[in-house]
Amino acid sequence: MTETQSLELAKALISRPSVTPDDRDCQKLLVERLYKIGFAAEELHFGDTKNIWLRRGTKVPVVCFAGHTDVVPTGPVEKWDSPPFEPTERDGRLYGRGAADMKTSIACFVTACERFVAEHPDHQGSIALLITSDEEGDALDGTTKVVDVLKARGELIDYCIVGEPTAVDKLGDMIKNGRRGSLSGNLTVKGKQGHIAYPHLAINPVHTFAPALLELTQEVWDEGNKYFPPTSFQISNINGGTGATNVIPGELNVKFNFRFSTESTEAGLKQRVHAILDKHGVQYDLQWSCSGQPFLTQAGKLTDVARAAIAETCGIEAELSTTGGTSDGRFIKAIAKELIELGPSNATIHQINENVRLDDIPKLSAVYEGILARLLAGNAV
């Protein structure tokens, strides 16, 4: 493929150091491009976060691309082989922070829109973009707030493509059609501090928690299903003591996380954890935080259309998967009938020397255009 517009736009976006939640006028650049082909733009900024809702058309179905202009920090700049915010072509790849996650995806969808609208100026339905600068950070003032606004006025999405990097070995080999939920716990086990030579005068919270910890790690929370692996329980941090070797600690702090399937619920997991702790007589405080519920798009029109577009452009059959971390799809699913994630390789995201293959860039744009054509121009699947 010789199409170069996607590459040039990706470079323009990467060159803007939009470390979360700073947008650095990335969204302004997108608005300038899409305004020329009939998109209306609505700014929905909250705090330091910039959000934009772009839409062309007023009819249904609504096909929406969702993405984020913010990127994670670069890490030690001296470890990069080229400056992270100077997009560099090298060894058949485009290097730069945000190349994979996810400025290339945004660029590819914009250029796909430009070509599609040029060929189908009177297309069916509507095309929309939901872009935020707060996905890599706290994600409190970004997509979730925009979804609240759209939901309040009854503006729904029929088909949503989130441009997160999803490819494993080659472009198009994987589509995410769902994500696991994420539930975190911050547990404080209470004991009684004392001299280590007089354990009968103290209560060691490490010892009282140990049997409960064993049971928590061995518990089968669910068996998963055809779309989701079994729910996973993992300890992320555990800390207790004063640093001295002769003091029994007065408390133990344990941080843990569930990545849970649709076979489990937030309430059910909480109840089972409390039951195990109570069973072992643990004295504790436990604070919970759920950053996302599990969601699933059953195989249907959107997955069929995406797979057909991938097969046409990449010559491979895409696998449907729910593996990996959370994304803003967890918020958008509240107003989207069908939602998938589809983007470039995820092999170098958040890493030093983040990159994408140069020849994947025009292909990804063509895949997005193929999805639009099948959903809004009546092209056969």
Curated annotation (Swiss-Prot):
Keywords, comma-separated and alphabetical: Amino-acid biosynthesis, Cobalt, Diaminopimelate biosynthesis, Hydrolase, Lysine biosynthesis, Metal-binding, Zinc
Enzymatic reactions: N-succinyl-(2S,6S)-2,6-diaminopimelate + H2O = (2S,6S)-2,6-diaminopimelate + succinate
Molecular function per GO: acetylornithine deacetylase activity; cobalt ion binding; succinyl-diaminopimelate desuccinylase activity; zinc ion binding
Domain of life: Bacteria
Catalytic residues of the enzyme: D70, E135
Residues annotated to bind Zn(2+) 1: H68, D101, E164
Cofactor note text: Binds 2 Zn(2+) or Co(2+) ions per subunit.
Pathway participation: Amino-acid biosynthesis; L-lysine biosynthesis via DAP pathway; LL-2,6-diaminopimelate from (S)-tetrahydrodipicolinate (succinylase route): step 3/3
InterPro entries per the UniProt record, alphabetical: Bact_exopeptidase_dim_dom, DapE_proteobac, Peptidase_M20, Peptidase_M20_dimer, Peptidase_M20A
Disulphide bridges: none
Binding site for Zn(2+) 2: D101, E136, H350
Coiled coil region boundaries: none
Cofactor(s) annotated in UniProt: Zn(2+); Co(2+)
EC number: 3.5.1.18
Known function: Catalyzes the hydrolysis of N-succinyl-L,L-diaminopimelic acid (SDAP), forming succinate and LL-2,6-diaminopimelate (DAP), an intermediate involved in the bacterial biosynthesis of lysine and meso-diaminopimelic acid, an essential component of bacterial cell walls.
Family under the similarity heading: Belongs to the peptidase M20A family. DapE subfamily.
Binding partners and assembly: Homodimer.
Protein name: Succinyl-diaminopimelate desuccinylase
Species for this entry: Neisseria meningitidis serogroup A / serotype 4A (strain DSM 15465 / Z2491)
Gene that specifies this protein: dapE
